[in-house]
């Protein structure tokens, strides 16, 4: 049973055909408490509604706590069966993203009532109201809501935008929400944020990443109404400087903030960051206005005693000297720092600041391949790995994504890699650019039976999101 618990469900299903003993184990309901029926995710797909209803009754039953359903399986008989046979179901994902037409929900009379988390992947063209109005009475206990838009699937061509779900009605049915994630939804604007703030006074975390219509005009109302709001993520929103400066940040409980790629001015960034009472997590990447003077003034005028995570990716107007002074002063508390995309960040800076960063768990450095010509010097990776090994005993995630023309290593690199592997036993992920050095490091870790640690920057990346207080609740898909 314990061995089977480590296998994906598609392998468990295949193993059921080996013998009667394995079939008995494979059908044990304890192995099916978390199920994805989206074939592109899990490899599992049920081809008939009748078969799924049989599985819910016999295989899943009271053990089921989490389920993902694709569009073709979201029907009222299936949802009725989940409500009746799965009393412990607390997490559900409903994927409408590929839908061209909804099923008929006129006869739907039941829906799981103990849900704590619900994720809905929206379609670009299917209006959800026919389905949503049938479930409003069953979801008032929701604490975590994900509405996932079509940002990653959108074409570059301008298309007509439809408001496919009525957020204003939805917020009235979910007064107990603590975490709301509106990801990449092309119709979401400040009126929708204001709607959630009017009814969800328990809100602790709001993420509107990649919602380009959000300008910040709702920030003042949001911060005044939601006194428990600690985490606000606005990556690539179209924030306006005057709207951001008008919000009363000094009276808020905000501790975690993402303003990546929001094109704020230096004045607005400084005004915002110095008024937050106590910040612990900041992502301010891709901001041309985040300069040496902003970094210096922020350090002198803000309360940074609790700062544990800082992301300055692609803030290429920062100098090595300014970063050295800032990290030297505040680095002792940092658990995660992202400095990739900054040409002045090389092994020499890390060698100077790493003795201060003794609590560091996440470190990201490097340069995107299409920007590698901006590097002002070569990076001696042997010295870098030796420095990290000596001072980063708590290191969990490390990314050194410089290309092979920028990295310099020697025949003695194996010794430095050995030292890094032995002295950083908690290292879960080491991301490198594909090439000769990557092959050397990967082979070294594989010989030590740590085959999943070393990864290429084509398939993996590192960030500070693991340090968010609501990281687990914010995971979707």
How would you describe each model-predicted region?
Residues 1-477:
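The conserved beta-strand core of Leucine-Rich Repeat
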């Amino acid at each position: 049973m314990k061995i089977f618990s480590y296998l994906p469900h598609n392998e468990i299903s295949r193993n059921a055909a080996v013998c009667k003993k394995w079939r008995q184990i494979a059908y044990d309901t304890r192995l099916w408490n978390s199920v994805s029926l989206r074939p592109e995710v899990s490899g599992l797909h049920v081809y008939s509604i009748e078969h799924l209803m049989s599985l819910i009754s016999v295989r899943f039953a009271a053990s089921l706590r989490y389920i993902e359903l694709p569009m073709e399986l979201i029907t009222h008989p299936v949802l009725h069966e989940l409500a009746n046979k799965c009393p412990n179901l607390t997490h559900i994902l409903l994927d409408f993203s590929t839908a061209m037409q909804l099923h008929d929900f006129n006869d739907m009379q039941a829906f799981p009532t103990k849900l704590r988390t619900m994720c809905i992947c929206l379609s670009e063209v299917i209006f959800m109201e026919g389905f949503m109005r049938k479930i409003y009475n069953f979801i008032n206990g929701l604490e975590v809501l994900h509405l996932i838009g079509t940002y990653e699937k959108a074409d570059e061509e301008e298309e007509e935008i439809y408001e496919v779900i009525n957020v204003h009605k939805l917020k009235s049915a979910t007064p107990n929400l603590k975490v709301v994630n509106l990801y990449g939804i092309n119709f979401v604007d400040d009126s929708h944020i204001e709607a959630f703030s009017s009814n969800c006074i328990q809100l602790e975390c709001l993420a509107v990443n990649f919602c380009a219509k959000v300008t910040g005009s709702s920030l003042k109302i949001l911060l005044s109404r939601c006194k428990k709001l600690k985490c606000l993520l606005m990556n690539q929103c179209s924030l306006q400087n005057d709207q951001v400066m008008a919000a009363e940040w000094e009276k808020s409980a905000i501790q975690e903030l993402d303003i990546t790629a929001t094109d704020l001015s230096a004045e607005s960034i400084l005004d915002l960051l110095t008024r937050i009472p106590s910040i612990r997590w900041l992502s301010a990447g891709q901001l041309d206005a985040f300069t040496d003077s902003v970094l210096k003034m922020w350090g002198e005028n803000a309360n940074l005693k609790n700062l544990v995570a800082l992301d300055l990716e692609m803030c290429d107007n920062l100098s090595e000297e300014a970063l050295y002074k800032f990290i030297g002063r505040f680095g002792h508390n940092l658990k995660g720092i992202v400095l990739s995309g900054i040409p002045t960040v090389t092994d020499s800076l890390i060698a100077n600041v790493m003795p201060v960063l003794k609590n560091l768990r996440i470190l990201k450095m490097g340069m995107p391949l299409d920007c590698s010509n901006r590097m002002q010097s070569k990076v001696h990776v042997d010295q870098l790995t030796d420095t990290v090994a000596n001072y980063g005993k708590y290191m969990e995630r490390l990314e050194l994504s410089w290309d092979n023309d920028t990295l310099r290593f020697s025949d003695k690199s194996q010794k430095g890699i050995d030292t890094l592997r032995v002295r950083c036993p908690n290292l879960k992920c080491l991301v490198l650019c594909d090439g000769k050095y990557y092959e050397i490091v990967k082979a070294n870790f594989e010989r030590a039976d740590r085959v999943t640690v070393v990864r290429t920057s084509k398939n993996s990346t590192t960030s500070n999101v693991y340090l968010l207080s609501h990281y687990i609740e914010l995971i979707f898909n």
